[in-house]
């Protein structure tokens, strides 16, 4: 019984830890100025193996499950609400590209707090590593899938000169 109480207590504290840490990281991430994401950073570059996002769909079937991911705006009002994408124009697509970069960065950073469990019991460490990966990697994959497609759409719109609808 004591062992069960200990596991329940540990699970509760780990859950509270992740809730507080991830909400704070998301909140801080929404405060990063857009100009940071307009610059070309290597971490947001689409690499050759990604084949403009096709890699992610081929190996992870992103199109089948990406719509099931909870919209971050429902948890944090500072997160860009994708429902505002009513029209497809240069300004909106540029904003969406910025937000894919922001979301990817936030989720990469959200994995890092798992290091606090490094000295803990093996089972606690593995459960928390698993949680950190399962909670963040799918969102990173979706951003890496969507961004090259949005970038291609942006190029097409710029060629047509469609600044506003």
Curated annotation (Swiss-Prot):
GO cellular component, one term: plasma membrane
Signal peptide residue numbers: 1-28
EC number: 2.3.1.-
Compartments in which it is found: Cell membrane
Gene Ontology terms describing biological process: carotenoid biosynthetic process
Pathway: Carotenoid biosynthesis; staphyloxanthin biosynthesis; staphyloxanthin from farnesyl diphosphate: step 5/5
Pfam families, alphabetized: CrtO
Role, per record: Catalyzes the acylation of glycosyl-4,4'-diaponeurosporenoate, i.e. the esterification of glucose at the C6'' position with the carboxyl group of the C(15) fatty acid 12-methyltetradecanoic acid, to yield staphyloxanthin. This is the last step in the biosynthesis of this orange pigment, present in most staphylococci strains.
This protein's name: Glycosyl-4,4'-diaponeurosporenoate acyltransferase
Gene expressing this chain: crtO
